Amino acid sequence: MPGKWISALLLLQISCCFQSGNCGKVLVWPMEFSHWMNIKTILDELVQRGHEVTVLKPSAYYVLDPKKSPDLKFETFPTSVSKDELENYFIKLVDVWTYELQRDTCLSYSPLLQNMIDGFSDYYLSLCKDTVSNKQLMAKLQESKFDVLLSDPVAACGELIAEVLHIPFLYSLRFSPGYKIEKSSGRFILPPSYVPVILSGMGGPMTFIDRVKNMICTLYFDFWFHMFNAKKWDPFYSEILGRPTTLAETMGKAEMWLIRSYWDLEFPHPTLPNVDYIGGLQCRPPKPLPKDMEDFVQSSGEHGVVVFSLGSMVSSMTEEKANAIAWALAQIPQKVLWKFDGKTPATLGPNTRVYKWLPQNDLLGHPKTKAFVTHSGANGVYEAIYHGIPMVGIPMFGEQHDNIAHMVAKGAAVTLNIRTMSKSDLFNALKEIINNPFYKKNAVWLSTIHHDQPMKPLDKAVFWIEFVMRHKGAKHLRPLGHDLPWYQYHSLDVIGFLLTCSAVIAVLTVKCFLFIYRLFVKKEKKMKNE
């Protein structure tokens, strides 16, 4: 009987979808890791609303698993890059970024960062070439007549596929280094006087010295840093599209930019009509915990529990560091649930249980959870915001330093340095975040802000995708600045013209005064001679 009801509801949903004419075909060019987790949340909701979703999956992708998403359709195709190559590259990238990249100033880590990003650019260029050169795949996509393409611009190529298929496309994005893509292709307005550039590790109000550092970072990312190697990508895009173009120009044709952030994490800055903020779209009310885990949580009594997770991308932690962490956790009266996949530390206390996987969102939503020790990835930070849990941040790579810097500035977190952190540092941070009501108060305040939106983040994302499908784009929201070359966008031609006019007027004025002066001098001399 329940099966019949489910079938009936599905039929009703599909019939309503067809009657309203809103059902569509969505093509997806995904990125791996947490990027995929976020975009998958959107795709699952699209399927629930009756849309047909097809995900392009390069064979080199090793995290994205079609078996875990039976409602989505996958087009897997061969690539010249192997899974092992891509996996080894990302493992090395994360480890170098976590333990070797200098973070004193943007200039101190710039050579190593650029070298890592160049490797990323080359791998994705290979994947992109494998995609568009696959005639059988592209013919199949042409025949499918998709209505829209959804992509993450950090994994370039989605915009090229959309252009070849002549369909509109949207971006779902957390950030690009230094806001490079957002500024060069999206024309985002991010004044360095009060908006800390991403990867600077700064958050909130800046001192004079902070603003100097921020300006240096901005100049570096705007003029020296390259997210993608334009010398390789631009000719490739021009060749495929049959006209002179660039990667940045093609990216600039995105109908909407769905940014996986919001004003609970970010500080206010100007925004554009074709940009919307969908941070925390993956967050949900908590589900019941497994019985053994619930029993352990309940055994904590009035002290409650601490959730500890440094994510799944960091492949190594020294035994010394693991023992220091375990010692610090053993000193607090709270029970601890620690996501850890290494050798069991010798200093592990009886109050701590180690798990290879944790239902993180459900634990953070549990009434006994007192604090969250996190690597400060955007997903974990947003789950903590959603449930109003204060944080101890131990950032490692990417924008994690920026995420936790914002939370510290908003009074909902303290932060530690993974490279220099001692066991006493972690112990003191835990005592501060648990015992000082200041942090809990601010975490709850951020949670209230997050929940008090006119539309849920996931609903906003789906709305804009359906909007673009209904109207075949969103050109009326696209600022005219997208169509201007850089010198016109910054009014350099106008400034040059006005400076030239001012110079001409100044020269003419001086010449006129000199002429009049000489005329009077000559007359005076003539009168004296007479």
UniProtKB/Swiss-Prot annotation:
Intracellular or extracellular location(s): Endoplasmic reticulum membrane
CDD domains for the chain: GT1_Gtf-like (cd03784)
Main subcellular location of this protein, as a coarse class: endoplasmic reticulum
Catalytic EC class: transferase
Annotated S-S bridges: none
Induction per the UniProt record: Constitutively expressed.
TM annotation in the entry: 494-510
Gene Ontology terms describing biological process: cellular response to ethanol; cellular response to glucocorticoid stimulus; cellular response to growth hormone stimulus; cellular response to testosterone stimulus; estrogen metabolic process; response to lipopolysaccharide
Catalytic function, reaction form: glucuronate acceptor + UDP-alpha-D-glucuronate = acceptor beta-D-glucuronoside + UDP + H(+); 17alpha-estradiol + UDP-alpha-D-glucuronate = 17alpha-estradiol 3-O-(beta-D-glucuronate) + UDP + H(+); 17alpha-estradiol + UDP-alpha-D-glucuronate = 17alpha-estradiol 17-O-(beta-D-glucuronate) + UDP + H(+); 17beta-estradiol + UDP-alpha-D-glucuronate = 17beta-estradiol 17-O-(beta-D-glucuronate) + UDP + H(+)
Membrane topology: Single-pass membrane protein
Gene3D superfamilies: Glycogen Phosphorylase B
Signal peptide extent: 1-23
Family the UniProt entry places it in: Belongs to the UDP-glycosyltransferase family.
Protein known as: UDP-glucuronosyltransferase 2B17
